[in-house]
Amino acid sequence: ANTKNREPKVSSVFLCFSIFYVTVLLNCNHVYGQTSTVFACDVAKNTNVSSYGFCDNSLSVEDRVSDLVKRLTLQEKIGNLGNSAVEVSRLGIPKYEWWSEALHGVSNIGPGTHFSSLVPGATNFPMPILTAASFNTSLFQAIGSVVSNEARAMYNVGLAGLTYWSPNINIFRDPRWGRGQETPGEDPLLSSKYAAGYVKGLQQTDDGDSDKLKVAACCKHYTAYDVDNWKGVQRYTFDAVVSQQDLDDTFQPPFKSCVIDGNVASVMCSYNKVNGKPTCADPDLLKGVIRGKWKLNGYIVSDCDSVEVLYKDQHYTKTPEEAAAKTILSGLDLDCGSYLGQYTGGAVKQGLVDEASITNAVSNNFATLMRLGFFDGDPSKQPYGNLGPKDVCTPENQELAREAARQGIVLLKNSPRSLPLSSKAIKSLAVIGPNANATRVMIGNYEGIPCKYTSPLQGLTAFVPTSYAPGCPDVQCANAQIDDAAKIAASADATIIVVGANLAIEAESLDRVNILLPGQQQQLVNEVANVSKGPVILVIMSGGGMDVSFAKTNDKITSILWVGYPGEAGGAAIADVIFGSYNPSGRLPMTWYPQSYVEKVPMTNMNMRADPATGYPGRTYRFYKGETVFSFGDGMSFGTVEHKIVKAPQLVSVPLAEDHECRSLECKSLDVADKHCQNLAFDIHLSVKNMGKMSSSHSVLLFFTPPNVHNAPQKHLLGFEKVQLAGKSEGMVRFKVDVCNDLSVVDELGNRKVPLGDHMLHVGNLKHSLSVRI
């Protein structure tokens, strides 16, 4: 029973709890989820509430919260430190379930949200790894906006909460990570832009008032969390040993952007330790960075059962009361779980934590609910009160799910006269493979019930007549069933083979040990390709990269597409690309490594940078020195695109004060904290020409290589833009480059520096040298 978020430890205690949980749900669905619209300050039920300051929305959030917490007993405050917050009936405050999920659509994972005959499903978008491949920030926000509309609609009929523990913005550091599919990939800039964009889509109200929230998003899992269960190493006890340079250069930027640029309402701390300290009990990470440096306006929540984990699994404290006190004093406001509810009272009695710290924590929680309008009375009279079942799974929302999948799909190989196929010329199409008729597989994890499914087979059959053979009994493919598949491929005009993974191969609590196609899938692909009469298109459905070197070099396999987990409309999107209704424009958001990489690099080594002394090859395109199967940013379209730099400086002079030490010393870099960084920016203008006849979206990726100082990245994404180009047309793209933000690197101590010397800018095959001098 996977009832706990991020699938917690399977222990006898957990199994007992699961049985209890299911029993309670069956007998009384009022316990764990909203069953009618839940809100405070209901004048119809209790006229006294109109006299309470916390119900007066003409007051500031701060004043309202202050009025509320003064009225609460210590026990009532403690009852509001857990995800299943208790009711305070004397003040007209109902119980509230904080835990809902919306990773790529409203999900019924977590007790705060469920479906019913009133709303049987919600729009399931592609998994974030595929959405990220679109390199389209406006798409990230558009999806968030649709998801929050559907969430509000479900809240209004008592089926959902207002607090969503999404997105997952951890860096996809290692190809084996089972949860990489949930993330925007391996690059800090792309992940940062995704975080801010998706969060804005979820949270922003129509009037743009940043003090109000449409729904409350949550960026997780803070921080350096990317090992679940690898060769017996569990996330509950894993100590991520991370250098200050890697922390500030790789792992922290998405969270910083989420808080500062996205103005997110919540951050979730992770299970793992970082350099010996559990993240949920690290005051430097929580109070120091999230609240202090980044100024979070919202609440900090633990990953589910993390407070219990740091006592029971990590043995970080001697008692449960100590665990409760340590986390609250470190800056935790809300516990996904029951530990704070059970043990905070005892911690107060033992003098381990003071009531003021508890008041501070619940104040952050209540402030979030105030911003959501939870204390403004009847939601039907509030903004978004008109949303309801009619606004879920609308044709427009379902079309956006299809469009998101199309924009993300990546074309990795395309021989002449392969794709696109002509629906007029193809009279028979063989559709083969364990994911060829996938439905549930397409929506990945943290999923909801979709509006409907279109499998690859259904999508392709809408274009041409098909014959189908799965070729494997399941995705694990222990025994390939090649005969039927080979037979239909031998006579068909073209063959589509849909292979890859599913949640039995890569998932939460399940990291891969190899990155080859599972079981006998490779044998199936080779043998079918060998007898195929026409072009063979290999379609890979997966969250992580696969070593498909064999398919790259096999001339019989004429095209390769990676489709991630493409969501409810994935099959339609795949067919749109294969038959040329849509020109592919996705680019890989992560490196695809050879199998040899995972054979020699332990998943537990957190170092990003290569170490020539030990032969350690480094991680991600920014630092990895070895061979790749496919590289970050790879992706083709059906035509070619030419880039041309129209305007870019060759020299940038940094104005330094006369007495600056670098005027006399041989400085290799300048500190970005100094005054010389203010307003130091320039523009780069690029022309982008579509040489093909077919209209196309195109992602322009601007990289730079800094001078070789501070063990800097060998290449780094500086910016990206999606442009729409008609056939044979030209467009202009402008990048505004802030020298100290965009051309800086993180030094060995975690400080940002601008390297002096020659920086190389790259776009496609173009290179432009830019000198930064004093």
Curated annotation (Swiss-Prot):
It is found in: Secreted, Extracellular space, Extracellular matrix. The active site is at residue 303. Proteolytically cleaved in roots to form a 65 kDa protein. Pfam families: Fn3-like, Glyco_hydro_3, Glyco_hydro_3_C. GO terms for biological process: arabinan catabolic process; xylan catabolic process. GO terms for molecular function: alpha-L-arabinofuranosidase activity; xylan 1,4-beta-xylosidase activity. It comes from the Eukaryota. It catalyses: Hydrolysis of (1->4)-beta-D-xylans, to remove successive D-xylose residues from the non-reducing termini; Hydrolysis of terminal non-reducing alpha-L-arabinofuranoside residues in alpha-L-arabinosides. Its EC number is 3.2.1.37, 3.2.1.55. Belongs to the glycoside hydrolase 3 family. This is Beta-xylosidase/alpha-L-arabinofuranosidase 1.
